[in-house]
Amino acid sequence: MPNFSFVFFYDSAKITPISTALLGRRMNYLKIAQDSLSVESNALLQLSQRLGDDFNQVIDLILACEGRLVIGGIGKSGLIGKKMVATFASTGTPSFFLHPTEAFHGDLGMLKPIDIVMLISYSGETDDVNKLIPSLKNFGNKIIAVTSNKNSTLARHADYVLDITVEREVCPNNLAPTTSALVTLALGDALAVSLITARNFQPADFAKFHPGGSLGRRLLCKVKDQMQTRLPTILPTTNFTDCLTVMNEGRMGVALVMENEQLKGIITDGDIRRALTANGAGTLNKTAKDFMTSSPKTIHQDEFLSKAEDFMKAKKIHSLVVVNDENHVVGLVEFSS
């Protein structure tokens, strides 16, 4: 008896097993995926073309807000709302998610009258969402409706309306929030990016909210925190063979050419290759000053590591000499692309 693996599809209350061997011959999944992405990309284009002055008014409202941007939604709309909150909060717009059902049972106490409330409902008729409206009006909160139905209960009671209409969901049954979820997510990103630009939100600001992980290290860490202080140094008169020995022992692929505590140059793997190409066996008779790179690039020890890395990327170099206030060499920072 042959071995079959099965995929289960839910059809109402029934569970129907379908052999994956048969399934693979039935459909071209690539075509389905491409069609889905085509529909969704077109929906994003339509959203872009549909944006009007309401969008500008919402941005101005949020910029002037002295409270928080509170976002609420149910189901997929709620999940999208949580992602919006995460983006806003990390880019300079204080924000939190308010579950409409929980809000109706006590969490409304989290609100202040100066907060702005953004409610997401594609139909605009989600009962748990709309039940909040009288309380929000009573508190004095401004309401932003994110919906496809400008004549809905939510839209009619909101102060501002952002339209997320889509022609259809890519779900074959036109039921599961797919295209509409993407459009809502993209609208949230468009709002966040506009606010970032309006506030001139810089990497240093971003770093304050992302102190952990590689991102935080790059944005908050200073050069002096990561630089190597045990440096491979040679004199201008050091011969080629001894230079190679120092570079090998230093394990950095470079040697700093120093004289009287002053930086005269740097020798990298590239300098070694160029010297050998130009001089062949005669390179053995050369000294450091003959093939070093004079006036190497430097950076101050108190600069952010991100600046050092960006500089090395731009100059296409892998090592940068670190100096102090007196312009004395105190370290070396490396970058691996």
UniProtKB/Swiss-Prot annotation:
Keywords: Carbohydrate metabolism, CBS domain, Isomerase, Metal-binding, Repeat, Zinc
Annotated positions binding Zn(2+): 99
One Pfam assignment: CBS
Residues binding substrate: 92-93, 99, 105, 131-140, 165-167, 237, 290
GO biological process: carbohydrate derivative metabolic process; carbohydrate metabolic process
Domain CBS: 227-284, 292-337
Family of the protein in this entry: Belongs to the SIS family. GutQ/KpsF subfamily.
Protein name: Probable arabinose 5-phosphate isomerase
